[in-house]
Amino acid sequence: MVTARETRRNGSRPSGLKKWRQKLDGILLPLAGILGFLIIWQIFSSSGATRLPGPLSLFTEERTRELLLYPFLDRGGLDKGLFWQTIASLTRVAQGFSIAAIIGISVGILVGLNRQLNAMLDPLFQFLRMIAPLAWVPIALVAFQQNQPAAIFVIFITAVWPILINTAEGVRQIPQDYNNVARVLRMSKSKYLMKVVLPAALPYIFTGLRIAIGLSWLAIIAAEIVMSGIVGIGFFIWDAYQQNYVSDIILAVIYIGAVGLLLDRFVAWLQRWILRNM
């Protein structure tokens, strides 16, 4: 005789197997897609239809294989492994992005709380955010006369707008009930800011931060390609192109994509952690 407990136990097995199957699908299907893309790319390259090397060139080209196996290589000057090139670019991104986050969130809150200020500044913000990052490079070089501060400025001016605009929108979307409660409780401005404005606007702020971190990474790569004589993965790509090291470029592009993905995931994790602990 089958008991109710056994029925429940047997009934739970398919759901457990289904969960494991879903987890495996979440891993195997993306891997299958990537593998299929690499195979098609290699076949297309081997057929002679293009001069673009296939993914196997990362292992068959001696110089590229050295870069792949020895990312911490440092011969001094600009001759560094991809780890150090990436770290140099990330350092600039961290500086420019941090400045953009501080200014973007602060100004965004002010603009979101003040309708007249928003009406006065919004057209200027919309105008400036439409300017491509590369267009700022010559202006930054003329203004700062040095590559490092110019690169940081390009990152800042690229990243600040999505942070500022999303923060302002988040503040404007605060429910009126929250504001009414704050008035009834006679909250001070600082307490209103910390207890009402920031928690309510936080999802919008992090949306802006996620957009901005991706744009910052794209901007520094583009800026470093234009700027000469600096350590960074963007200049590494341009230098490899000048010397016709196409396999090196492909490896650097893989680094760029992987780092960009990690940056986005880090900001998403930070958002979940902060919201969970508030």
Swiss-Prot record:
Which Pfam families does the entry mention?
BPD_transp_1 (PF00528)
One GO biological process this protein is involved in is: monoatomic ion transport
Q: What induces its synthesis? A: By carbon dioxide-limited conditions, probably via CmpR.
Alphabetical list of CDD domains matching this protein: TM_PBP2 (cd06261)
**Which topology term describes how it sits in the membrane?**
Multi-pass membrane protein
**Gene3D superfamilies with a match to the protein in the record:** MetI-like
What InterPro entries has UniProt attached to this entry? MetI-like, MetI-like_sf, NtrB
| Membrane-spanning parts | 24-44, 93-113, 124-144, 151-171, 196-216, 217-237, 249-269
Give the protein name, as stated in the record: Bicarbonate transport system permease protein CmpB
Organism this protein belongs to: Synechococcus elongatus (strain ATCC 33912 / PCC 7942 / FACHB-805) (Anacystis nidulans R2)
